[in-house]
Amino acid sequence: MKKLKVTLLASSVVLAAALLSACGSNQNSSTSTKKLKAGNFDVAYQNPDKAIKGGNLKIAYQSDSPMKAEWLAPLSDDATFGSMSSPGGGQDGLFFTNSSFKYINGGPANVSLYKDAKTATITLRKDLKWSDGSEVTAKDYEFSYDLTANPAYGSDRWTDSLANIVGLSDYHAGKAKTISGITFPDGENGKVIKVQFKEMTPGMNQTGNGYFLETVAPYQYLKDVAPKDLASSPKSTTKPLVTGPFKPENVVAGESIKYVPNPYYWGEKPKLNSITYEIVSTAKSVAALSAHKYDYINDMRASQYKQVKDVKGYKVLGQQELYISLMYYNLGHYDVKKSISVQDRKTPLQDQNVREALGYARNVAAVQAKFSNGLATPANGLIPPIFKEFTSPSVKGYEKQDLDKANKLLDEDGWKLNKSTGYREKDGKELSLVYAARVGDANSETIAQNYIQQWKKIGVKVSLYHGKLMEFNSWVDHMTTPPGSDDWDITDGAWSLSGEPSQQDLFSAAAPYNFGHFNDPEITKDLNDIDSTKAEDSTYRKAAFIKYQEDMNKKAYVVPTAYAINYTPVNKRVVGMTLDYGAMNTWSEIGVSSDKMATK
């Protein structure tokens, strides 16, 4: 199942599969039949019945925010739509991967890496077409770079990693009209692309590495749309071209997508006649499942697990999540002209002791125990445990509450407790911070207020942004619109990660997703070390990952919160369902064994 590099998620307690929607992406191969387990969950559902011909699969994505339809990957950062777009191609991903997230051949395109030449060659399938029957070309692959690197399109996916492509930084800065490092051996209308790098990195053979793009965009279809209008154009929102086994027949803004088979799909023809994919609110999802309205619902919350685990007619599947939730501190702004974070904000949070104290004051373990139903665990570092070769329990984070240590850190930093107010002061100023907490599920308000009370115990006054939780889409706009806002101090984030654990795209000085805009030479060195040629040695790379996590915990620019197991209740009429990371299948092979939902 394919993933984009990083994708924002709505809930910070525990998330379902995000882009790892229960049926993977458009790249389809045979279904895995291995009896895989994640914790106590089966990863796949082995339906004893065969699929009927045709049928309609009914899927929902649980969200309290509207669907933001954007069919161009460089212009989208929303996990909800990333999942909902997957029957049509998951915003048109290109490569197959195995269960270790390494590239394999056989998908819409193959990639070959040449270490000595410092190049990648991407070869598109000869029969790869858009859903209008037009050829997918080399120019369509380059166009994804145009969308990402040309500021006129408004993408927030430009990173230091992409700057490793020869000529792409000059193009991004407006110093060049073309990208010198991307060439077409067979011409723009051919099927071969060569990408020239400045340096090769050890993670380049992993999906989501961030050093080259994994998607295409239909250049001929979109070339006449003005860059400033493209993100909102019907051609990218409601009437797109796609490459997957299904194509959108109808897109209802904010609500739903109806898919029908794509007659120009290169692979196995779908078994289903149609797929409907809808938004369902957290308030209605459990009732909808109990009424057998959907075959499955993506992004069920951990807090709902007890309500859905025994609903008749469903099998609950699970998978270790490529997921990390964390707390951010607002430390600076993003310099758009220079594409770099500047850590210049005047705030008590510039003091490391204050950041650490806020981290140690949180009772994350108690929150997870109360609300996650065993589906989330406190995080000791920024790398999820599914990447067991790159993390270690020896990394010490903020998973255990330590109010004594938090108080000591603030005492050492000169923050004195005013006994009449109960809050700390320094140089005549109260330690008062704004918490931009956001809506995730029914427990979001309770969890936010809980953390505010924990911070009060150490004398830190924290109030919600404008006195309430932020709606998720508003929060995303607030955090991702450069140069950033000065009206918040603390926020939470949750990320659906890629198969390459390097976090250049999250925390490098150039990463727009570095919401707090910290810029630290030591962290930059750590990130670069992870991707250096020395890190081609797996032992060296693991040590580099551990050092990076230890340094991030020490400096506390962000504070890890939780890891998660995703679960998905699947109706027992569904055939060919798996959450296996190595399964590139299912949108063609998934089917139903009956026209009616199973109820027993």
Curated annotation (Swiss-Prot):
Q: What subcellular locations does the record give?
A: Cell membrane
Entry keyword annotation includes Protein biosynthesis = no
Q: Name one GO cellular component term.
A: ATP-binding cassette (ABC) transporter complex
Q: Which SUPFAM superfamilies match?
A: Periplasmic binding protein-like II (SSF53850)
Q: Which residues form the signal peptide?
A: 1-22
Principal localisation: membrane
What topology does it adopt in the membrane? Lipid-anchor
Q: Which InterPro entries match?
A: Peptide/Ni-bd, SBP_5, SBP_5_CS, SBP_5_dom
> What does the annotation say about its assembly with partners?
The complex is composed of two ATP-binding proteins (OppD and OppF), two transmembrane proteins (OppB and OppC) and a solute-binding protein (OppA).
Protein task? Part of the ABC transporter complex OppABCDF involved in the uptake of oligopeptides.
Family as reported in the entry's similarity comment = Belongs to the bacterial solute-binding protein 5 family.
* Name of the protein described by the UniProt record: Oligopeptide-binding protein OppA
The protein's organism comes out as Lactococcus lactis subsp. lactis (strain IL1403)
Gene that specifies this protein: oppA
